């Protein structure tokens, strides 16, 4: 099988912004990530060996001068010394342990220094998706002209509806080539004439560079999941907001607030932090309900919600985005990040429903290990040690 990931920055922007944050705040932290397949897929026999081959290839993937030049130009909030670090960074396949049982289920654990292991999430997920679609014949049946036409039609619908819209589809993309095709179609449509909507770019740093787009992304849930073990569930959001703003001095101002549900976050959101951050990201729960809660919280702090960004990203399709946009009706600065519906909406191909989540951590190599969990604004939806999830839910009430 050919090598799938050949570019160092074929990765989401938040990987880099979180990595630098970790280097600044928790440079000695060690973690464990776990692969979760929500579809409980039975992968073809030998899939683990093919995936291991892709993992081994990653040892030779290094950042280029061109990539460094692009990132230093676009990501001015990252210091130059960080790119010196990236020049020396090497993917370490020994951090990844892959197993496949007799039924075909995959088990993947990633363990090591947090600042190092964070780089694996996106390459592993996108490799799994592309390998599976290749092995089950989806790639062989791919109709390029048809898929390009679908991407054009979808783009026209998006921008015609006035949506502020970006791609977040690297992790579960059909293939590398298909994500590139979709982004080229979106850019072509957007550049063809003035539209009510706006194309904000892509979370994929490589494609942003190659296609002349804006790289998008700020942070991920893992920062809050880790912090809960440092400062507790009721203070972790505030402390991540404070530390993240310390690191980036007000840049990267979209906060992902739902890691332990909305009440924990809103009850501890100060006016200072609400003003420091340009907006919030809605990644779970009912979008209309969450919008009303966000608006009410901003108003209670004396802040005009219409000046604040709200990024919606909870498994959306275009029709859902349009419905949310109509509901917002200018009351917030709404925008949309869509993944699978953009990069894996292929006829007769079932998208993967896979994630890699932080499940254990310790603040230094000499401290004890703790379980990391993630709740959400979706009732009953939890990730991680279920006993701890139940305990934290009992505290939240």
Predicted regions: what they are:
Residues 1-240, 245-246, 355-397:
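Ordered alpha/beta subdomains of enzyme catalytic regions
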Residues 2, 211-397:
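Glycine-rich phosphate/ribose-binding loops and adjacent secondary-structure elements
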